[in-house]
A protein has these predicted regions:
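Hydrophobic faces of stable alpha-helices that mediate helix-helix packing
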Residues: 60-64, 68, 149-153, 157-160, ...
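Signal peptide processing junction and immediate N-terminal pro/mature segment
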Residues: 21-31
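Bacterial N-terminal signal peptides
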Residues: 9-20
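Acidic/histidine-rich, surface-exposed loop or edge segments in extracytoplasmic proteins
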Residues: 41-51, 135
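Short, contiguous alpha-helical
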Residues: 29-38, 43-44, 57-61, 68, ...
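Acidic/histidine-rich alpha-helical segments that form the ligand environment
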Residues: 126-168, 182
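Bacterial N-terminal signal peptides that target proteins for export
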Residues: 1-11
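Short amphipathic alpha-helical segments with heptad-repeat character
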Residues: 54-57, 61, 143-146, 150, ...
Length: 207
């Protein structure tokens, strides 16, 4: 029996891969858009996450969803709020968390299957250098992109079947796959907590 993947989720994965609004590492936008995507691969349900990775994948995704729950409530002005204490905007935190996860996993997946591009959407690190990818997006839209990153990671997780938790994954500096998955969980929780602290600042926009 063939299982069908929801159309909205198909579009999420496809849009993430062709990256019409940003270039992938080492490729122009035109080349990224030309990456072949087989319709049958998208229409079929994704292969399950390898059993030995399920627990830590679930933990990473749960942390992402907790973060989405916080961002989803924010308006576009709140997402772009620049704290007087010089810390990052909530939008930077959303882009940074999703960007790091996407880059690390796409590096690994590309090493295992070169048809999958390396995707680097990481924002500049320093607040003064930061330029948002979508300055008009509200928190719901940023949360949807964060979910698409999780969808991408889960869809191609079958490539990790022969990599054990204590093994060093290819093409990254991470000492083990376990270390990467646990750090992604911590990363979401830490940055989300930093965003929540901004709500108590006197200049936080009330909307």
């Amino acid at each position: 029996m063939r299982f069908r993947f929801p159309i909205s989720r198909l579009l999420s994965v496809a849009c993430l891969l062709i990256l019409a609004d940003r270039s992938v590492e080492g490729q122009t936008n035109d080349k990224a858009a030309a990456i072949p995507i087989e319709a049958s691969a998208l229409l079929d349900a994704p292969r399950p996450v390898p059993q030995h990775l399920v627990k830590l994948f679930d933990r990473m995704e749960a942390a992402n969803r907790r973060s989405q729950d916080v961002f989803r409530k924010l308006s576009a002005p709140q997402m772009s709020f620049k704290p007087s204490n010089g810390t990052h905007t909530p939008r930077w935190n959303a882009e940074h968390m999703a960007g790091r996860q996407l880059m690390f996993f796409s590096q690994i997946y590309h090493a295992l299957d070169p048809k999958i591009p390396i995707v680097n959407l990481n924002p500049r690190q320093m607040p003064k250098d930061y330029r948002p990818r979508h300055p008009d997006w509200d928190g719901k839209q940023e949360a949807r992109f964060m979910q698409r990153v999780d969808d991408f990671c889960r869809r191609y997780a079958y490539l990790l079947e022969d990599i054990q938790l204590e093994d060093k994954p290819p093409a990254t500096r991470w000492p083990s796959l376990k270390a990467l998955l646990l750090q992604m969980e911590r990363h979401y929780d830490e940055h989300t907590a930093n965003v929540e602290k901004k709500f108590a600042l006197p200049d936080w926009p009330q909307e």
